């Protein structure tokens, strides 16, 4: 779980190698979502200069607005199971967000968000 959370939310998800989607297979799906939410709920948020910070601010106002739009879209394309709003005041902070969807063609499942939003989908098998 730490590797998924770090990949999805480190650098506020602003890296090309960020995990944007996770697929849970069969009976592990519910446990996967529960564990992801638990781990993302305690990721340290803050200024990038603080050593304990795992999720800092987005790069600029355009990025902030884009990610907030995707968070709003996520409510129509899936179930938002975690949206951290305990972010520092001021700046372009967006907390980790975990969304579950059963729509593999949803925008939140197919577009590059480049922010701290992780989409989780279920698969019956490989």
For the regions a protein language model found, what residue spans apply to each?
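Glycine-rich nucleotide-phosphate-binding loops and adjacent flexible coil segments
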Residues: 116
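Short, surface-exposed loop/turn microsegments at beta-strand edges and helix-strand junctions
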Residues: 112-113
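ALDH superfamily catalytic-core signature
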Residues: 1-103, 122-126
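Short, solvent-exposed loop/beta-turn-alpha elements that line the ligand-binding surface or hinge
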Residues: 109
